Design a protein with these regions (language model features):
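Core alpha/beta nucleotide-donor-binding catalytic domains of modification enzymes
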Residues: 2-112, 122-126, 133
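C-terminal target-recognition/interaction regions appended to catalytic cores
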Residues: 222-373
Length: 373
């Protein structure tokens, strides 16, 4: 197995995809302990093989882990960055908001992996020339780099999710070829939303407040035995593995007005639709309420799953049930397998899932990189 390190690991979507591609995680870092609870629950990492805390603290104590960091094949990371807009004229490295980005570069410099991946929002493309200069400043001329915007839907996955990737290596590999190979992968099927979620049990609206621990057949369960009907999509995300339990498929609370709106809106409609104008008479305030509600279309890919779902799922209304998507449905869209279990509170599940890299997109990237190792 090829050795990889995952920084800013979150709940483990990127790691899982790389593991499915043939990499083995030898070390992971995440500052958010609730996110990392899920990461650790789903894999067996020895205690000295992870660090829960700020990457800057990891860098300050890097000698403690040096034995683990020998001959690393791949380092992955998506450092949170807020200074990538065109409007920001400050140098990236001088912007205090980007200290985690700087820490990621420092880690690469210290570890010198054969390959690295940096993944981030598409706004990173606005500063790509400066970013590549930063890489050269930290890593010297031993590394070559390529970059690309990749959208999950272009690879047959049921989500419109565009992210920016930089791949670098010190083996002399032309990374342009890696991105070309990724883009030219033969797509066996292009999945849409109904493929991803329609085989899961139906849930009824939940209008009872303050009941996050309650579970039943109406609003769903944290964990329950379940016999899945055959689904080509489930077979795809589960890699053919048969799973006999359903996890994290639980409906959240909504007030009666929301539930009524969920039922009235047709698929593909938002808050401006005439079907709810008697409930939301805001014709002169369209710019405020346009993005308040949206009912997903079963025959299209899903809009981008985001961590905002931890607050509400009003922009992610199920196509034919008067409710928002459940965490398991969101995880399905992010191509997590059905036996990947999310820990913490239901709201926290949404945050974990929304911040993840789609597992099958990560696997696709990993399979191309591992060919050169």
């Amino acid at each position: 197995m090829k050795k990889m390190i995952d920084l800013f690991a979150g709940c483990g979507g990127l790691s899982l995809g790389m593991e499915q591609a043939g990499f083995s995680v030898v070390f992971a870092n995440e500052i958010n302990s609730s996110l990392f609870e899920t990461y650790l629950y789903n894999r067996n990492l020895p205690k000295n093989s992870y660090f829960i805390g700020d990457i800057n603290d990891l860098n300050n104590n890097i000698d403690k882990y040096k034995e683990l960091f020998i001959d690393i094949d791949l380092v992955c990371g998506g450092p949170p960055c807020q200074g990538f807009s065109m409007a920001n004229r400050q140098r990236i490295l001088d912007d205090p908001r980007n200290n985690l980005y700087k820490a990621y570069l420092f880690f690469l410099k210290e570890i010198q992996p054969k390959f690295f991946i940096m993944e981030n929002v598409k706004g990173m493309a606005n500063k790509i020339n400066e970013i590549l200069e930063n890489f050269q400043e930290f890593l010297g001329k031993d590394y070559s780099y390529s970059y690309s915007l990749l959208n999950a839907k272009d690879f047959g996955l049921p989500q419109n999710r565009e992210r920016f990737f930089i791949i670098g290596n010190k083996l002399g590999v032309n990374t342009d070829n890696i991105f070309n190979n990724i883009r030219n992968v033969a797509i066996k099927k292009r999945f849409v939303l109904k493929d991803a979620i329609f085989d899961l049990p139906k849930l009824k609206p939940n209008n009872v407040k303050n009941n996050p621990k309650i579970e039943n057949s109406d609003i769903g369960f944290f964990e329950i035995k379940y016999k899945y009907p055959y689904s080509e999509y489930a077979n795809f995300i589960n890699n053919g593995k048969k799973i006999n339990k359903l996890y994290n498929h639980k409906n959240r609370y909504n007030n009666d007005r929301d539930i009524e709106i969920f039922g009235l809106l047709p698929q593909g409609a938002n808050s401006l639709h005439k079907s709810i104008e008697h409930i939301m008479p805001y014709k002169n305030r369209n710019h405020i309420f346009k993005d308040k509600y949206f009912k997903l279309n079963e025959n299209e890919v899903c809009k981008t799953i985001t961590s905002h779902m931890k607050f509400d799922c009003n922009m992610y209304i199920h196509p034919n049930q008067p409710r928002g998507l459940s965490p398991r449905e969101a995880a399905r869209i992010q191509t997590f397998p059905d036996d990947y279990i999310f820990k913490g509170t239901p709201n926290n599940w949404y945050a974990q899932i929304g911040n993840a890299v789609p597992v099958k997109l990560a696997e696709l990237i990993g399979k191309e990189i591992i060919k050169y190792l």
